[in-house]
Regions:
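Compositionally biased terminal segments of proteins
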Residues: 1-182
Length: 182
């Protein structure tokens, strides 16, 4: 399922909210895997289908059949291969990252249809906030971008909720008048 800044941007566009001041140029995809052998098989499949490997272990670039594209994609494995809610890329266990809430967020992922052609699962804003909070706990001394992303989600999630909130039906409003207040 799609996570990261692009998931945030897609959700905010669907909700017709203002764009984030911090834009992204990559796609982060969380994939539940049984073990690191499955990650290697996935890597081989990507390399056979117009992707090239980037330097970071999770990074790939989609080149396309004509070789003219250069779209960055980070694959974030989680699931049975994690230990203590973290993944650590073999053989040296580096990089290591927390995937503490990825299973829970996957269970509440939204289904999004893009351009009437592509259907993807995507972390909902509440799940994106949880992932950002966990990431902030890991690296808040190194960067403030996760805090800025959380603030943006909180500010705009509330506005989106209010703008899409359904009015209370007249029957409910009328019924409440017939009760005595204590």
């Amino acid at each position: 399922y799609v996570v990261g800044a692009l998931a945030r941007d897609i959700a905010m566009e669907i909700l017709e909210m203002p764009p984030s001041p911090r834009r992204t140029a990559d796609l982060d995809v969380a994939i539940a895997l049984k073990d690191w052998n499955q990650f290697e098989l996935l890597k081989e499949h990507l390399l056979e289908n117009h992707f090239v490997k980037g330097k970071p272990k999770q990074r790939f670039y989609y080149k396309g059949a004509d070789g003219n594209n250069d779209y960055e994609i980070d694959i974030v494995p989680f699931g049975e291969l994690e230990a203590d809610e973290k993944v650590a890329w073999p053989p040296e266990g580096n990089p290591e990252m927390s995937v503490k809430c990825f299973k829970d967020v996957m269970n509440i992922a939204d289904t999004v249809v893009i351009d009437d052609a592509i259907t993807v699962k995507m972390a909902p804003l509440s799940g994106q906030f949880l992932i950002k909070f966990d990431t902030w706990l890991d690296r808040h001394l190194l960067t403030d971008k996760d805090a800025a992303d959380m603030l943006y989600i909180m500010d705009n999630f509330y506005l989106a909720y209010i703008s899409f909130k359904q009015p209370v039906p007249d029957e409910v409003q009328e019924t409440s008048e017939s009760f005595d207040l204590l």
